[in-house]
A protein has these predicted regions:
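Hydrophobic membrane-insertion alpha-helices, especially the h-region
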Residues: 20-37
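Conserved polar/disulfide-associated segments of primarily extracytoplasmic proteins
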Residues: 18, 72-165, 170-174
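N-terminal Lys/Arg-rich, disordered targeting/topogenic segments
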Residues: 1-16
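N-terminal "mature-domain start" segment
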Residues: 42-79
Length: 189
């Protein structure tokens, strides 16, 4: 009988140590997740060195080293839009792109909702989250959708004049501040 008691006590001590080790491991995982989340969502200040007035009446200030491609394009979904991209090759793993379309409230019934539905149909789980963006003289509604190793950023920028800028962007997880800075520099000409 004393042998069984010693055996049970030793087993309980091992179990307690194992549970303590598991708790420490879980806590370290939580801390690592928080640190990574803060790094990914850091707000890097913008240093725009280029101003561009697009044909569609949208102006943007941007960093030419980050956005070397700035041009008007015809997009299948958005039509005539201003495109800023990190390069010409969309197959590049670090490729990021933002499209700006000017319209009014009637251009889309629910731009963000429709875009989320399209992304969900194409990629499955997209995990949309609201993003707080500020554009001077406008009301901004924006979401960030997590798509595997990428973020899709969708926004509507509504001006008092009735004009609306529709924004669609795609970036790597660590580069979301590049798109945030770009969107926050938008104005109408």
């Amino acid at each position: 009988m004393p042998h069984d008691i010693d055996h049970n006590t030793a087993a309980q001590r091992r179990t307690s140590k194992l549970l303590a080790a598991m708790a420490i491991f879980i806590c370290l995982g939580i801390v690592a997740y928080i640190i990574l989340t803060l790094l990914v969502n850091r707000q890097t200040p913008a240093n725009p060195d280029t101003h561009f007035d697009a044909e569609n009446g949208i102006s943007v200030d941007y960093e030419s080293a980050i956005w070397p491609v700035c041009q008007m394009t015809e997009d299948a979904a958005l039509g005539h839009a201003l495109q800023l991209a990190s390069g010409e090759d969309s197959a590049n793993a670090n490729y990021q792109v933002v499209l700006f379309q000017r319209g009014d409230k009637a251009t889309y019934e629910d731009f963000i909702g429709q875009s989320e539905a399209d992304l969900k149909a194409a990629y499955g789980v997209i995990s949309p989250r609201k993003v707080k963006l500020q554009v001077e003289g406008a009301t901004v509604t924006a979401v960030r959708c997590d798509i595997q190793a990428y973020y899709a950023v969708l926004a509507t920028i509504e001006y008092d004049s009735g004009d609306v800028v529709y924004v669609s962007g795609l970036t790597k997880l660590a580069s979301i501040s590049d798109i945030v800075n770009l969107v926050e520099s938008v104005s109408l000409t």
